[in-house]
Amino acid sequence: RSGPLRVTDTPRHKVPLLEKMIAAAEKIGLPFNPDLNGATQEGIGMSQVTIARGRRQSTAYCYLDPARGRSNLVIRQGALARSLVLEGKRCVGVRYAVGSEAREARATREVIVSSGSINSPKLLELSGIGRAEVLKGLGITPVHELRAVGENLRDHYSPRVKFAISTPGATFNDNARGWRLAREAIKYALWGEGFLGMTSVPIRLYFRTRPGLETPDATVSILPFLYERVGHERRISKRRGITMNVNVLRSESLGSVHATSTDPAAPPAIRFNFLSAQADRDGVLAAIRKGRELMATSPLKEIVSEEIAPGPLVQGDDELLDWVRHNAETTYHPVGTCRMGTDPGSTVVDPELRVHGIAGLRIADASIMPTLTSGNTNAPCMMIGEKCAEMALSADLVQKSGISVT
């Protein structure tokens, strides 16, 4: 509780339909779990969130803002990393651009890349680190071959199952327009209260889709409102209802991310290959049906007026999978493209996050995760950053002390 990041429980009394959700979940074998991040994850419970007094506790707010005044910290906004500066097999800096101005930052100790699962492998490839055939295809001279760069991409793939609710005031939709929205805005501005200061996903179910599993392998995240897509925007619907985000927790479908050009501004080729693994197809079908079972159980079934999506006519495996492929979305949890491990042939960084075969270079972001976490990647990424900083500082102290560590 003394760290920089505040973690809070979603207040149970502030979530519409919660008590009905708990009662229905218990009837289908999912007990109320007061701590989904505790000893056991299974059941229905409230989200634990990085929100305090209605404000999201981002890394910028918790870590960067307090450090902005330090003399040993320089922040370059609007900078685009172009490539790493390599001297042989040692990384000594980063080439970057601010607007049209090319610049270079030199390191006296180490370079730590934290560009994320999409851009970290791309930056390595632009620097000549990766699969030789990928690099040569772009006209980049290979400096160091690491075949796992850009491979092993995984993500949480989520169809949205939607239900219309007949009871007035039972969802956030009623408070998202007119004078009620004005009231919510005032509550948020004065006290950080109301639904504007809450997570959009206050309720979660974790469960096993098949016998023999040690831990839950699927989740249904419940949004107590309906929303609509208008172009690239999401807007709360005028219609009253709930949305269920369905996820297979540890996806086995593997994709890739690779540079497409020597131009650092060019987007990479991202191939998720969602649902390519049979286990993922089976898991998402079971999870959709679990969500439907919940909503068809008292006391929820009495207030459900309609299944909006995928709809009551979509029932068979093939029909459901076709609907998922056309409607599911990423949850923006990509991992694994610079995966950690001891084998340079199948991984990119070692257990201390050092890039295999390149001195002075570490990676600290979700790309180093060997597989997906059974939840959001936000907190794990903060842990990776803290651990990487600790290891880099320890290595520096060892070097200065002259002590040999074996």
What are the roles of these predicted feature ranges?
Residues 33, 74-76, 141-145, 221:
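General small-molecule cofactor/ligand-binding pocket signal
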Residues 140-161, 301-315, 393-406:
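Active-site-proximal substrate-binding core of FAD-dependent oxidoreductases
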Residues 162-285, 322, 330-336, 346, ...:
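FAD cofactor-binding and catalytic pocket of flavoenzymes
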Residues 371-392:
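A conserved FAD-binding loop/helix module that cradles the flavin
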Residues 83-184, 194-195, 249:
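Glycine-rich loop(s) and the adjacent beta-strand/alpha-helix scaffold that form part
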Residues 141-143, 206-214, 279-303, 317-326:
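Flavin-binding catalytic cores
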Residues 1-91, 97, 160-183:
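Conserved redox-cofactor binding core of oxidoreductases
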Residues 47-52, 76-87, 218-234, 238-245, ...:
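A glycine-rich dinucleotide-binding beta-alpha-beta segment and adjacent secondary-structure elements
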